[in-house]
UniProtKB/Swiss-Prot annotation:
It comes from Leptospira interrogans serogroup Icterohaemorrhagiae serovar copenhageni (strain Fiocruz L1-130). It catalyses: UDP-N-acetyl-alpha-D-muramoyl-L-alanyl-D-glutamate + meso-2,6-diaminopimelate + ATP = UDP-N-acetyl-alpha-D-muramoyl-L-alanyl-gamma-D-glutamyl-meso-2,6-diaminopimelate + ADP + phosphate + H(+). UDP-N-acetyl-alpha-D-muramoyl-L-alanyl-D-glutamate binds at S38, T166, T167, S193, R201. Pfam families: Mur_ligase_C, Mur_ligase_M. This is UDP-N-acetylmuramoyl-L-alanyl-D-glutamate--2,6-diaminopimelate ligase. Belongs to the MurCDEF family. MurE subfamily.
């Protein structure tokens, strides 16, 4: 909906009018929307100039069609811009990073679409995509019109949209939620990344439930340290909409699970918490059985009840994912028996423990998104549970990202695999050979990888050719991705396709 500039300034007193073209009346200015991408702006929009834009502020403001510009109060930057910019621009200022206000403004301009939706947001280092996809399947099977927002894209109705982000920017996110509401969606399962939470992309979103999977090392190129990373994840529980039947779900036994549990309890003592394997043992997992046909376990329920859970999803980590999904389903009112039945036939989640067999099924490959030390360890151990005669782990590490995890992942691969192949992930602007050098520092003295090949396609072919009968090649790091970033170029690349070609499947 359109709004007068004066009305917006009254609604958001933290925004001040810095510069206004002479001859115009502020009350005559109508605002349609707010965008942080200058290319998406229209004349009556606000261009939100995020701090992260850095030195390109002038360039992006010049290219923006928006007549209103919102940026952080900084007299030097503002005065410099006012001297060189077209005087027809209206400059607004605030004391904080404008990106922190963007979500609240976007939600307000669209009539708060999230208020009419049950939004379940999942955060954690690993498991977000799997868990949201499992929840989407469980709810859909019970006739709920639901939507999905995450790493693999946005899904609702017959629509699938690739946003390129785990958590879209605040303006895009609110537009997506508005479309979902208009399409009759009632429940949304979304991934809440630490980047998205710290940058305020979910500010202004009405979240009913927050789910936490785990917290292990990742993104230390973005977060100053693990405590900053933890606090960014905790932010999800600070933005819960307590006007709804709000609740939290977490894995108490997961890394940083107990820490989060007690912090939530201290800050929000009245918040309902479903804690898997908590200190009161209300939701305890036992009798786990793992094989290539599926996974089963017993989930303890309050009142000394138990429920046998069986699922086609593979790997010990999917024990935790499905159990967390079950608890979340209880929170949103799903039928227990129907959930149990649905878990037996969850659709394959792209790039998550995705098995590809050779034509004669004598060898296999597993494609998985694991790109953190914890995720790599979990997937290798899960593949080990299938007892392959030989396990070769192929992986690399992303360029321009947290470098400290590189030797740690090498150590894990060496200790848990029979052979290791080093290759490129998304090298971005780093030299691929330099990345591999840094990974190799984590190997023990004298350990030599089976192969070191920066060309990922060639590495996969070589890995498949080295597999003995009964062997398995784990291709870790990219999972569902259908691209590879080399330099600043994004090229088509799919681990699944490369494995299929190497097996001669097409």
């Amino acid at each position: 909906m359109k709004m007068k500039l004066t009305s917006l300034l009254l609604k958001f007193p933290e925004i001040k009018l810095k510069s206004f073209p002479s001859g115009k009346n502020p009350d005559s200015i109508e605002i349609e929307y707010i965008q942080s991408d200058s290319r998406k702006t229209n004349k009556n929009d606000i261009f939100c100039v995020a701090d992260s834009i850095g030195s390109k502020k002038k360039e992006f403001i010049s290219n923006a069609k928006a007549s209103l510009i919102l940026l952080r109060t900084d007299s030097n930057v503002l005065n410099d811009l006012l001297e060189v910019m077209n005087s027809s621009k209206i400059f607004l200022e605030c004391e904080i990073d404008p990106e922190q206000l963007q979500g609240r403004i976007a939600s307000f301009l669209l009539g708060h679409p999230s208020k009419d939706l049950d939004i379940v947001a999942v955060t954690g280092t690993n498991g977000k995509t799997s868990l949201t996809n499992i929840l989407f399947s469980l709810a859909k099977d019970q006739g709920i019109n639901c939507g999905l927002i995450g790493t693999i894209g946005v899904k609702f109705g017959d629509r699938v949209i690739d946003t390129g982000y785990t958590t879209p920017d605040a303006s895009s996110l609110n537009l997506i939620l508005k479309e979902m509401k208009e399409e009759g969606i009632t429940t949304v399962f979304m991934e809440a990344s630490s980047h998205g939470l710290k940058l305020g992309r979910m500010n202004g979103i009405s979240v009913r439930a927050g789910v936490f999977t785990n917290l292990t090392q990742d993104h230390l190129d973005f977060h100053s340290d693990m405590e900053d990373y933890f606090e960014s994840k905790f932010r999800l529980f600070e933005i819960l909409d307590f006007s709804k039947s709000t609740f939290a779900v977490l894995d108490y036994s997961a890394p940083n699970g107990s820490k989060l549990y007690h912090k939530i309890l201290n800050r929000f003592p009245d918040l309902l918490i479903y804690a898997l394997d908590d200190i009161y043992r209300k939701w305890k997992i036992s009798d786990i059985s793992l094989n290539l046909q599926g996974t089963s376990y017993v989930l303890g329920l309050p009142g000394n009840q138990e429920r046998k859970i069986s699922t086609n999803l593979l790997g010990s980590f999917n024990v935790r994912n499905t159990a967390l999904a079950f608890l979340t389903g209880i929170g949103i009112g799903l039928d227990l028996e129907k959930m149990s039945n649905s878990l037996e036939k969850i659709p394959q989640i792209p790039g998550r423990f995705q098995i590809i067999y050779s034509k004669d099924r004598s060898r296999m490959a597993v494609v998985d998104y694991a790109h953190t030390p914890d995720a790599l360890e979990n997937i290798i151990r899960s593949v080990r549970d299938s007892q392959p005669k030989c396990l070769i782990t192929l992986f690399g590490c992303g360029g321009d990202r947290d470098r400290t995890k590189r030797p740690k992942m090498a150590r894990i691969a060496e200790e848990l695999s029979d052979q290791v192949i080093l290759t490129s992930d998304n090298p971005r602007t780093e030299k691929p050979e330099t990345i591999l050098d840094e990974i190799q520092t984590g190997f023990s003295s004298g350990f030599i990888p089976l192969l070191r090949e920066v060309d990922r396609a060639k590495a996969i072919v070589e890995g498949i050719s080295c597999l003995p009968e009964g062997g398995c090649l784990l291709v870790a790091g990219k999972g569902h991705e259908e691209y590879q970033i080399i330099g600043k170029e994004k090229r088509h690349f799919s681990d699944v396709e490369e494995v299929q070609k190497a097996f001669g499947l097409f």
